[in-house]
Amino acid sequence: DDALNHAASIEEYQKLPLVLFGHSWGGYAVGNVLNMRSDIKSAVIVAGFNKSEDLLEYQGELMAGKGAKIFTPYMALYERIKFGKKYTAISAIEGLAKTDAGIMIVHSKDDTTVPIRYGYDKFYKEFGSSDRFEFVLYEDKGHDYLFYSEAAWAYREQLNKDYKSYVEDNGRNYCAEVKEEFMNKYLDKKQCFEPDPILMERILKMFDTYCVK
């Protein structure tokens, strides 16, 4: 909210419509900031989730087992004390219900960082029949590379194979220094992070539709 207020204070941005795009914790932030803003025209939530305590509980279980669940109320209390009720007593679902913005939800079924039960499934259950919402669910794009092209995926797979050969054929060890050396020599960032043109076109079309309303 503070970041948006800052942007709105800059004269050259004041006549522009506000649209949001967030991934993971950024997706959580996008959904929740809608509780505080009525001027957002459109928003995209990629691999996001509904409430922070859900993800804290999930990550706690991964690290410490089911017993971590008993600490969830204390973690929620810590968040409430540190960040205040304004930011912790809300959810993305509540924010999405308060806005008239066009919304796109993007997730992948195999996401193990933010499983779809904490985000996509909840959002679809609440808003699946709404014309304001577009839902994009992939099968196998994981968490970090949801919005990259098929060519980028293929390039990344080949890059990983080349890195393995670089290490083993030269008698090197797998370590951060060797990987950095390899990437500095061979990584083509434009190819590796090329966005998915089909998804980008859908996002731009939604932004255009809601920004002229």
Per-range role (PLM):
Residues 1-11:
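Alpha/beta-hydrolase active-site loop
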Residues 12-24:
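Alpha/beta-hydrolase fold nucleophile elbow
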Residues 32-85:
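Hydrolase active-site cap/lid region
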Residues 79-95, 101:
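Active-site nucleophile elbow and catalytic-triad environment of alpha/beta-hydrolase enzymes
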Residues 99, 105-107, 111:
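Short beta-strand/loop motif that positions the catalytic acidic residue
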Residues 101, 115-125:
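Short alpha-helix in the alpha/beta-hydrolase fold that links the catalytic acid
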Residues 110-114, 143-145:
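Acidic catalytic loop of the alpha/beta-hydrolase fold
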Residues 130-213:
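C-terminal catalytic histidine-bearing segment of alpha/beta-hydrolase fold enzymes
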